[in-house]
A protein has these predicted regions:
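Hydrophobic helical h-region of N-terminal Sec-dependent signal peptides
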Residues: 6-14
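C-terminal motif of bacterial Sec signal peptides marking the signal peptidase cleavage site
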Residues: 16-19
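Bacterial signal peptide processing site
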Residues: 21-23
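Thiol-based oxidoreductase modules, predominantly thioredoxin-like and allied folds used
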Residues: 47-52, 72-74, 86-112, 121-124
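Non-catalytic, surface beta->alpha helical segment in thiol-disulfide oxidoreductase systems
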Residues: 122-162
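A short beta-strand-turn-helix
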Residues: 49-67
Length: 343
């Protein structure tokens, strides 16, 4: 189990970075609301957020043959603020918003929570693309840079191939997957949709997908392999025998700055989990962890990363530093100073 006794410094980082859990509890006090989805003019200038109800938005999408972009957020959610001040203000996203019906849902309202329950929303921010017929196409994760976000969005809008269909193809007819399908699977928000995969899906599926696309799309391959490691780690508690995975693909990722940026969310938020399933002896694992944390710290000020993701560059260092310590040591003064400057 992770044992991070990081005091006030890491509490600040966690406040800025942790994906927010939705308050889908009907007993909690809710703010006043209207029956309409209100226009949020300050949440992204130039985006024509739909002003009617969700049902009206789906009816309009069907009539106009336009897909739907549905966003759940909350004013108190730091990652949501990052999305609003980066993605929603980018000229690319504003231009793309003319291609779909954009819906903004304030997660603190009872109506939004009801819609969230209907579509299985597990946390904030959540962004889902629906086809004009109302079928869910994909869920886009937070924690990726703006250029990648916009390219994934545009690709999903172009193909409108539902992720659940792609999963079935991956399981049964992988030769029928398109290049864009691999990228959609690689950038799907798996952690926010527990039903996208059939129950009991073997994590090895993602390793196999990573191998298939390794030459034509190294970034998608890297993300798919890291998803394999995350799923492998998640299933270890239930497994009778503990499985170990090849560390070579991760080593190659950590040696390529562009791949590090492209897999930043995995490398930052799942460091402990991924490291726990690598087939390495203690010395080799320590070397890889050193390479991992140094690579993230070296790139944390990359301009393509949001402020929150730049701060997340500290997670591997902090996680490896404190992991397993019954009585955690004090962080070096130089690192405390650096974290404070970044925050």
């Amino acid at each position: 189990m992770r044992k991070l006794m990081l005091g006030m410094i890491v509490s600040l980082i966690l406040l800025c970075l942790t994906a927010c859990n939705p308050a889908l509890d009907s007993d909690t006090e809710q703010p006043d609301e209207t029956a309409q989805i209100e226009r949020h003019s300050n949440e992204g200038h130039g985006i024509p957020w739909f002003e009617g109800s969700v049902a009206e938005a789906f009816n309009l999408a069907a009539a106009a043959n336009k897909p739907i972009f549905m966003y759940w957020g909350a004013v108190w959610c730091p990652p949501c603020q990052e999305i609003k001040h980066t993605v929603f203000k980018s000229p690319e996203f504003i231009a793309q918003s003319k291609l779909f019906i954009p819906i903004y849902l304030d997660g603190d309202t009872e109506r939004a929570q009801s819609v969230g329950e209907e579509f299985g929303v597990k946390g904030y921010p959540t962004m889902i693309i629906f086809s004009p017929q109302g079928e869910e196409v994909t869920r886009i994760p937070g924690g990726i840079d703006i250029s990648r976000y916009n390219s994934i969005l545009l690709s999903s809008l172009d193909t409108l191939r539902p992720t659940r269909m792609l999963v079935q193809l991956a399981l049964n007819s992988p030769d029928q997957l398109l290049a864009s399908d691999f990228r959609q699977l690689a950038y799907y928000s798996w952690g926010q949709d527990f039903e996208a995969l059939p129950v009991g899906t073997d994590p090895i599926l993602f390793s196999q997908l990573a191998e298939r696309v390794s030459n034509q799309d190294p970034e998608a391959s890297a993300r798919l392999y890291l998803q394999y490691l995350v799923m492998l780690a998640a299933g270890q508690d239930e497994a009778k025998t503990r499985q170990k995975a090849d560390a070579a693909p991760l080593t190659r990722i950590l040696a390529a700055p562009e791949l590090i940026i492209g897999t930043w969310d995995y490398l930052a938020y799942y460091a402990i989990e991924i490291a726990s399933v690598l087939d390495l002896d203690a010395l080799a694992l320590a070397r890889l962890q050193n390479q991992w944390q140094q690579a993230m710290l070296d790139l944390r000020h990359n301009k393509r990363l949001s402020t929150a993701e730049q701060l997340a560059g500290w997670f591997p260092y902090l996680g490896f530093y404190f992991d397993g310590d019954a009585t955690p040591a004090t962080l070096p003064t130089a690192q405390i100073t650096a974290i404070r400057l970044d925050a």
